[in-house]
Design a protein with these regions (language model features):
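N-terminal, post-signal peptide beta-strand-biased segments of exported outer-membrane/organellar beta-barrel
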Residues: 9-74
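Intrinsically disordered, low-complexity regions
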Residues: 13-16, 45, 56, 98-101, ...
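Transmembrane beta-strands of outer-membrane beta-barrel pores
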Residues: 50-54, 71-75, 94-100, 124, ...
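Short, conserved acidic/polar surface loops in the N-terminal third of protein domains
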Residues: 78-80, 100-105
Length: 176
């Protein structure tokens, strides 16, 4: 129906997935903010997605200096902000989750997780650079507390070679 088509066409994640799955190829899409934080200067955003327990919201505003914050109701986001000035942008996130669950052969167990995110982007004459750092840890009562560290580097620029007009390079590393 028309309403379903309209909902899908305005949803960034679904739109990017249908176009190849990588927001880096579509410079004018707001999902680029997560790969290249300096692109936040191209957008003023007030988005609310959903009206249930899984609602998400994004707010980004300002002219020469950008301020913003993001909310995702499926985690206890203590801090998830955006700030940018001139040719650079910064995203900072600090999220926690906790849960109580019952195992079939044990008493109630409690587990909690902590996720810290930092992303920096710079636009220059060379083009756009994005760096992402993410650390995640889980604490439970079993003594085996998994953790991980992730590093990402993204580069996008005009690079006319043969029939190609642009270049997008992404490097991601994750340890656990």
């Amino acid at each position: 129906s028309f309403s379903m088509l309209l909902a899908v066409s305005f949803a960034s994640e679904q739109r990017i997935a249908s176009l190849g799955g990588n927001a880096g190829f579509w410079e004018d899409d707001d999902q680029n903010i997560y790969m290249f934080p300096s692109t936040m200067h191209n957008f003023n955003i007030a988005q609310i997605d959903g009206n249930d327990d899984m609602a998400k919201a994004s707010f980004l505003f300002g002219e020469s200096t950008k301020y913003g914050f993001f909310m995702n109701s499926n985690s206890d986001e203590l801090l998830n902000i955006a700030y940018g000035s001139g040719s650079w942008g910064l995203l900072v996130g600090f999220d926690t989750n906790s849960a109580k669950y019952t195992e079939t052969d044990a008493d109630d167990e409690e587990a909690s997780s902590l996720n810290m995110k930092l992303a920096f982007g710079l636009s220059s004459s060379f083009r756009e650079l994005g760096v992402n750092l993410n650390t995640h840890s889980i604490d439970n009562s079993e003594g085996d507390d998994p953790s991980s560290f992730a590093f990402g580097l993204n580069l996008r620029r005009e690079q006319p070679i043969w029939e190609f007009s642009h270049m997008l390079v992404s490097f991601n590393f994750m340890s656990n």
